[in-house]
Amino acid sequence: MPLEYMGGRLATLDDVDVRGKKVIVRFDLNSPVGNGGEILDDSRIAEAAGTLRELCDRGAAVVALSHQGRPLESDFVSLERHASLLSRYSGVEVRFVMDVIGPEALRTVASLRPGEAVLLDNTRIISEDFIEAEGTVHARGIMVTRLSKLANMYVNEAFSASHRSQASIVGFPYVLPSAGGRVLEKEIRSLNRAVSSGERPKVVVLGGAKLKDAVRIVDYLSSSGVADEVLTTGLVGLLFLYARGYRLPRDVTKLLEKKGGEEAIAKARRIVEEGRRVRTPIDFVVEVGDKIYIKPADELTEGVPKDIGPSTVEYFRAKMRGARVIVMRGPAGVIEDPRFRRGTVELVKAALSSGAYTVFGGGHFRAILRDLPEHLSSKVGHLSTGGGALLYYLSGRPLPGVKALVDSARIFNLV
């Protein structure tokens, strides 16, 4: 059935007939890579395998695309190992071509038969796929022009890259009938429920260290009325305490200035001055030298706050009680260190015990949820792998990749 997005509708795999068609599928197989080129976390590849298998089972010939890393960085590698893993997880033999739009790639795509699949190499080998431009502009580019001539349909299965306006994300929907893949569909449906449904109250818990994005999200959620409560943790909580005039150790204020800049600090101050409903931690777990203390928020004169304290956990737990929807994005502390993991774990437990529909955003939650007892972990509504796309969604900004699918549904009369 069609999927609602920002007042429009896009097609899903349930709305299109793929039998006998050559389908370009843009996955996001981008994964952490070790020094030897080995893939350290293949969860995105495993997730993509289901969609690839479905399309092949339904009689499509699948041309898979993805990026990996950024040019000149250590994780900018070929997708050959990705193809091997995609084959293993999907049960489909996925051929690999060390080419994207050259003669070998085009010959392979042209000869592909129903039920077969090929993964072309890293799309960012092509400079067009590292340029931000409108979809109608990218539709005239070399990558989209060459590949679309050999295909009948396009599927976006890269929700986590859909905040980018790059050729392989936004160009194809303007020249080929296009639909959202299963992972993208699940992300949008879950986030629509979390943000756009009439279920109230909605509580959003924001932590982590991405201050510019977090302040933009707080600004949108608190001004639009989307969230009934915004609870801040991590560096985000410290930023809003700083905006309220709390004295913080110099090392902390320098970090806030470095991570957020004057713009984020000024915006946080404006939000505070307008009296919006943004809650901040009331105590912290603080590391001072080789010792650890619990300190109230108004006594942070030395050391480095590494986690929220027990009083904050109880304060925020009370705010979650009775919520119908809870969204958590970013950790409450430095969870890589077991000593500073408790705040995040306890908030996750509180959310799952509340009876609310819960959405967790960020890869760090995967490990935490895996360690919880089954009676709690089974209550997870949705674990988003959206990354930057999730931040865009929560801040009310349109996702170019999804908007292009809405446009395609209209252009090709798909829904």
From Swiss-Prot:
One of its GO terms (biological process) is gluconeogenesis. ATP binds at E336, G362, G363, H364, F365. GO terms for molecular function: ADP binding; ATP binding; phosphoglycerate kinase activity. It catalyses: (2R)-3-phosphoglycerate + ATP = (2R)-3-phospho-glyceroyl phosphate + ADP. GO terms for cellular component: cytosol. It is found in: Cytoplasm. This is Phosphoglycerate kinase. The gene is pgk. The keyword Oxidoreductase does not apply. Belongs to the phosphoglycerate kinase family. It holds the Pfam family PGK. SUPFAM superfamilies: Phosphoglycerate kinase. The lineage of its organism: Archaea, Thermoproteota, Thermoprotei, Desulfurococcales, Desulfurococcaceae. The keyword Cell membrane does not apply. Coiled coil: none annotated. Pathway: Carbohydrate degradation; glycolysis; pyruvate from D-glyceraldehyde 3-phosphate: step 2/5. Keywords: ATP-binding, Cytoplasm, Glycolysis, Kinase, Nucleotide-binding, Transferase.
